[in-house]
């Protein structure tokens, strides 16, 4: 996929700035990334020390396993990423970067990369809108592959599949 992503005309990376987080969230992200690195899995809410639990009304239900037990999800470098959805625009809790030294959620560009947007695709508007654009999109490489099949079907197989 390198040729799909890379554009030699670019002299940098766009949409790759991190969002700010309050100190308590940074502590949770640091714990989550360290836990994932050591355990090879993203932590469940029940794995968090009590001092790092969020002050939300549904935490008790989450600790009982009812829902939101995976509220803080690390995108592990050794596994496929989870599906990027538009919820990433609300907070980055489900999209924590795996490197503990970075202690942050994914940038728009990283989320876009996971969705297979080429690096030369520029997202406009406020960052929240950019995350929504990425999360609501059909992955471009998937759309490209489906389009090639549709063309072959409509042309009776006359067009040769591109080697992407």
Short names for language-model regions:
Residues 1-164:
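C-terminal target-recognition/interaction regions appended to catalytic cores
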């Amino acid at each position: 996929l390198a040729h799909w992503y890379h554009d030699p005309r670019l002299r940098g990376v766009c949409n790759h700035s991190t969002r700010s987080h309050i100190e308590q969230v940074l502590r949770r992200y640091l714990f989550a990334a360290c836990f994932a690195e050591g355990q090879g899995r993203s932590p469940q809410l029940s794995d968090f020390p009590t001092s790092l639990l969020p002050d939300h009304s549904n935490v008790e239900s989450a600790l009982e396993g009812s829902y939101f037990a995976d509220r803080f999800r690390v995108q592990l470098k050794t596994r496929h990423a989870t599906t990027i959805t538009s919820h990433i625009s609300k907070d980055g809790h489900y999209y924590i970067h795996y490197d503990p030294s970075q202690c942050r959620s994914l940038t728009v560009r990283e989320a876009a990369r996971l969705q297979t947007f080429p690096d030369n695709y520029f997202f406009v508007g406020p960052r929240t809108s950019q995350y929504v654009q990425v999360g609501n999109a059909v992955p471009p490489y998937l759309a490209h592959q489906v389009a090639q099949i549709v063309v072959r079907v409509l042309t009776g197989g006359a067009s040769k599949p591109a080697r992407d």
